[in-house]
Amino acid sequence: MHIRILGSAAGGGFPQWNCNCRNCRGVRDGSVAAQPRTQSSIALSDEGERWILCNASPDIRAQIAAFPALQPARRPRDTAIGAIVLLDSQIDHTTGLLSLREGCPHEVWCTQMVHQDLSEGFPLFPMLSHWNGGLRHRPIALDGEPFAIPACPRLRFTAIPLRSSAPPYSPHRGDPHPGDNIGLFVEDLDSAGTLFYAPGLGEVDEALLEWMRRADCLLVDGTLWRDDEMLVCEVGDKLGRQMGHLAQSGPGGMLEVLAKVPAARKVLIHINNTNPILDTASAERAELDASGIEVAWDGMHIQL
């Protein structure tokens, strides 16, 4: 299984266009040892020819430009993107569909709740129906059964409902439903390599831990270092848990969770611009290094 990190930042990217926090200011003027990042998205492939896009970032055009394997190479108009999987209906995970309209029709796999949000609150499905057939919805069931996507037939996907939040525009933002957010457990039938992918993760219970323990590689929510980070940095008024993100530090935080899991690789993705782990010289980054936890970067390639 080939895993390409197309984008590793949370919504807004890094640096965020209107943010003057220490990290964003520092990456612009070179005073912080950090590299810019686009908004979170990955691509998966079984053989490296056809790819499945997991979430469609607003930065998708730049991400394709940085990854030749997704670029047109066989016909005058062409793409190696064989399908798109949406793990939620967040703006920073779906807006890229607008930039992919010239390649319609696209197979878009998502839960019924995500499809509802993208048909009503942020109506991408009806909007894009005017472009060559638009988006063809392929439902993702929440029954725990593995499913295959024809573009990469040697991969098996299992959707895992997560405790997180629907996007702010959703009519059930404050009333969570199963399927608002999912994680993916992905298995390569040939190599037997396994991935657990959850860029938006608000809570980890024992059942979810069991899925995480089965994975060779964890690619999980790295949004915030501390739950009150947005308030401390004076860039927001919400706690991480109110936004559906489990902070890395503190009791029950992601560091404690990952310490319970034997995966060979533990990688944080969807990293907010305020998070001190973006600074490679920070004490927080040193703590991750000492724990064997990696920080995803744009262009990172993992093979399982």
UniProtKB/Swiss-Prot annotation:
Keywords noted in UniProt: PQQ biosynthesis, Transport
InterPro entries membership: Metallo-B-lactamas, PQQ_synth_PqqB, RibonucZ/Hydroxyglut_hydro
Pathway involvement of the protein, from the record: Cofactor biosynthesis; pyrroloquinoline quinone biosynthesis
GO biological process per UniProt: pyrroloquinoline quinone biosynthetic process
Domain of life: Bacteria
Assigned protein family: Belongs to the PqqB family.
Function: May be involved in the transport of PQQ or its precursor to the periplasm.
Protein name: Coenzyme PQQ synthesis protein B
Organism, as annotated: Pseudomonas aeruginosa (strain LESB58)
